[in-house]
């Protein structure tokens, strides 16, 4: 692949040695196990003050008998808390990636610990319902339900309801901005910022980046089609703005945004198009394309470019939260 960064080449070589089949060739359970093998590292954990996991009640009209919605809260240590006055710790609500089918609280534990440690914020990871067991709009409704609950319970955390941001990667980036849309549409909470890492924003497969990277071993067109087929309930769901936020009638009133894309990613063009639409709607937007990198690169901290992107996000969130990061 022309102009692929040497680090990305090394990553593909390493993943290739594991002989993991593409998601589209697996069952949902098999795809979940494969992602856990790749992302759950056995190295030393990033230290934070405390990690708690607890359930919240799903919305009464969800019609789902699967039980409560689990949240995992990463609390900063005393040094991190020292960045903020009492009762003013900011909150980052994080939605993991995985095509709405795979990924979980553990696959993205390292990234949540990183943001908590670097920012001194509370990071709340959302264990939303996954497809195909729970198709659209289950994940979208869970995304907003978690955000609303956090906004209503900030005193529980000693946090500030005025400094909440959302973030997510890939399908989680989709859910982060969908939660922001729902917060705008349904009366809050107000958000300071949204961080969208190579987000899926449109149920379409005809962009230049899809054509150029259709067979990319990190994320292919076939895999994205497989994800969407599992996620959507019916033929018209893909046009709903809570599934395809790029198709929202307007994006006015959304929080400022940082959109990260990767040069060798089928989702690059739709991420860029969404950043352009946000900016066109008057939303303060920063778009950074990491040319030569692959989808999901930020989840691999051994990559220098991943750490550059992480530092960019930390700086942007620090400014949004009223602190240098």
Regions found by a protein language model. Give the residues of each.
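A glycine/proline-hinged amphipathic helix-loop "lid/cap" segment
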Residues: 1-73, 322-325
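Short beta-strand element of the alpha/beta-hydrolase
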Residues: 87-98
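Short amphipathic alpha-helix adjacent to the substrate-entry channel of hydrolases
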Residues: 106-125
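Alpha/beta-hydrolase active-site loop
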Residues: 134-156, 313
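Gly/Ser-rich "nucleophile elbow"/oxyanion-hole loop immediately N-terminal to the catalytic nucleophile
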Residues: 151-166, 186
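Hydrolase active-site cap/lid region
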Residues: 181-236
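Short beta-strand/loop motif that positions the catalytic acidic residue
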Residues: 259-261
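Catalytic active-site module of serine/aspartate enzymes centered on a nucleophile-bearing elbow/loop
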Residues: 302-325
């Amino acid at each position: 692949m022309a102009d692929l960064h040497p680090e990305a080449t090394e990553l593909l070589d390493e993943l290739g040695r594991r002989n993991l089949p593409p998601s589209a060739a697996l069952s949902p359970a098999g795809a979940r196990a494969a992602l856990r093998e790749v992302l759950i590292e056995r190295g030393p954990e990033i230290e934070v003050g405390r990690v708690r996991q607890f359930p919240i009640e799903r919305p009464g009209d969800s019609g789902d008998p699967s039980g409560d919605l689990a949240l995992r809260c990463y609390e900063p240590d005393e040094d991190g808390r020292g960045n903020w006055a009492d009762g003013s710790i900011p909150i980052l609500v994080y939605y993991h990636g995985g095509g709405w089918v795979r990924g979980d609280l553990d696959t993205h534990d390292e990234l949540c610990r990183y943001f908590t440690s670097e920012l001194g914020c509370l990071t709340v990871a959302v264990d939303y319902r996954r497809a195909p067991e729970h198709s659209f709009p289950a994940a979208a409704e869970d995304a907003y339900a978690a955000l609303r609950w956090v906004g209503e319970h900030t005193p529980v955390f000693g946090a500030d309801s005025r400094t909440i941001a959302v973030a997510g990667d890939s399908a989680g980036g989709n859910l982060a901005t969908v939660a922001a849309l729902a917060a705008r549409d349904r009366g809050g909470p107000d958000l300071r910022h949204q961080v969208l890492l190579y987000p899926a924003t449109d149920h379409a497969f005809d962009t230049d980046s899809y054509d150029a990277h259709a067979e990319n071993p990190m994320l292919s067109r076939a895999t994205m089609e497989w994800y969407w087929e599992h996620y959507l309930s019916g033929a018209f769901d893909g046009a709903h703005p809570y599934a395809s936020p790029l198709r929202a009638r307007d994006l006015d009133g959304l929080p400022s945004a940082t959109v990260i894309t990767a040069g060798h990613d089928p989702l690059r063009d739709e991420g860029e198009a969404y950043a352009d639409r946000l900016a066109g709607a008057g939303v303060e937007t920063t778009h950074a394309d990491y040319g030569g990198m692959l989808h999901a690169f930020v989840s691999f901290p051994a990559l220098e470019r991943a750490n550059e992107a992480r530092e960019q996000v930390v700086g942007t969130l620090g400014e949004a939260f009223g602190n240098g990061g």
